Structure formats: C-alpha cells, structure tokens
Amino acid sequence: MSVLRLEHQNSMAESKEDEYVHKVYNEIAPHFSQTRYKPWPIVTDFLLNKPSGSIGIDVGCGNGKYLGINPDIFIIGSDRSSGLIECAHELNPKGYNVLVADGMHLPHPNNRFDFAISIAVVHHWSTRERRIEAIKHILSKVRSGGEALIYCWALEQGNSRRGYHEGMEQDVLVPWVLQDKKKKPQRQAKKNGKFQEKPDVASVPPQERAAFIAKWKREQEEKKLAEEINEELQRQKELEEEKKNTKYRYYHLYREGELEEDCIQAGGEVVRNGYEKDNWYVVVRKP
C-alpha cells in the first residue's frame, strides 16, 4: 500500500472517529457519566491484585471510576473527551490524576508503567490497523513483563437488550438518546370526561331537539378532531426532539478470538481472556 493511500485512509478514519466518537462523548459526557458508576468485578480484581506501590495508566478513563479502586497503587487516567475529564474532577474534588490525551498519542514515557487498563475504548477506532496500533501504543508505555487489561464490546451479546449476535455487521453506529431537561407536557387521555356522552336536552323545546342534537354532534366531532390533530402535532414534536437528542457512536463489535489476535499483532502475549458485561477482555503481557 502506498504512503499516500495509507495517509488518506488514516485521514478518513480520523474524521469518522472525530464525528462519531470524540464530538459525541463531549456532548453526552454528563449524562454518560451518570450511567457509569459501578466498577466491573474483573477490572476491580485486576487492580486490587497489583502490588502496593505499582504505577499504571487508565487509557480512556472516562469519569475515573477505576482510579480510586486500590489506594495502594498510583494510576494516571487519560481520556480524549475533555467533558468526561471534567466529570472525573467533579466526582473527586480532591483530584484524580487525569488529563486530556488521545489514546494514540499518550504523553507518558515509554517502558515506565507496571500495568495499564483500557476499558471499552479500543473498539472506537474505526479500522483494524488503528485498533492494533492503539493496543501497541498502550503496550509501549508498559515495562517489559507488565500487563494491560483491555475490554471491547462483543459481537456475541445474545442475552443483552442490544441483541447483537454472530453474523451481524461488526462496524455499527450505536444511538445514545440524551435526557431532555425540559419536562415533556403530558398528553390528555382520550377518555377524560371532556366530551359528553349524551346532550342535555331537558331545557330544549321538543320541536328544536333534533336540530340541537345535530348541532351538538357536529361540535363534538370538531372537538374530537381538534384533539386528535393536537395529539399528532405533539407526537411529531416529541419525535423531532428525540431525533435531535439522539447521538450516534461508532463501535467495532469484536467477535470471539478477535481481540486476542489484535493483541498478538500488537506484539503482546495473551495471559488470559474472557467475557464480562457484553465485552470480551484480554490480559496481555509485554514481552
């Protein structure tokens, strides 16, 4: 492949990631952070089993939920989203060690850290070459013998509400609907007593009742039609609002065994692997 062609492909991939990853996470950061508060067990165990005094990095740390798991180790967190880094600062006013940094261009020294974690991040790079390069870059920061724990969304999510499964497209745009801060007006129930079931003709002279009933029926039909039109307009407005509040994030859904292949291609040695929370994970050691 020519250098120019490779540069063009990288440029296209970067544009896609900017549009469907970086911009989106900055837009949804506060809402996203509210849904990311419970640490996953295997990540927690990985961190708790590190020797006291170990130093590591969390690449794509989000709101920093893993940074305080083990008080006896030191972790520097980074994320491409300045919005999520702000959330990390807000969640820990005393201050996490976090910074805004691209996962492909980490400012840390090479061969320095005892371990790394990157949870649900690598799948956002939009080509295999870039995903392998991202893993390689993470490993470059870890000393020889150090380990990195990497999680990526799985293609095989048969028991998940998302319903992804083997045979489906692996490169997908996943919707995220922002919460509308404005309270939606509640629609009136159709049967709320607004319309009379029968006209009151007690005070109407007998000879005028037929005309009175006919007029009453017309008025009721007009009111009913007006309410139906109003409900439809309200429904269309809500759909437009939801469409405006829906943001799409790019994901590569990893099939079983694929993450291990990428870690090996990145120069690592697979120590163990598994499945948790609709994600494949790999612990990869730097030779």
Identify what each model region corresponds to:
Residues A120-H124:
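Short catalytic micro-motifs in class I SAM-dependent methyltransferases
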Residues S2-H108, E129, K136, S144-P287:
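Class I (Rossmann-like) S-adenosyl-L-methionine-dependent methyltransferase catalytic domain
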Residues I117:
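A conserved beta-strand element that flanks and buttresses the S-adenosyl-L-methionine
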Residues G53, F113-D114:
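Local beta-strand N-terminus motif with an aromatic residue
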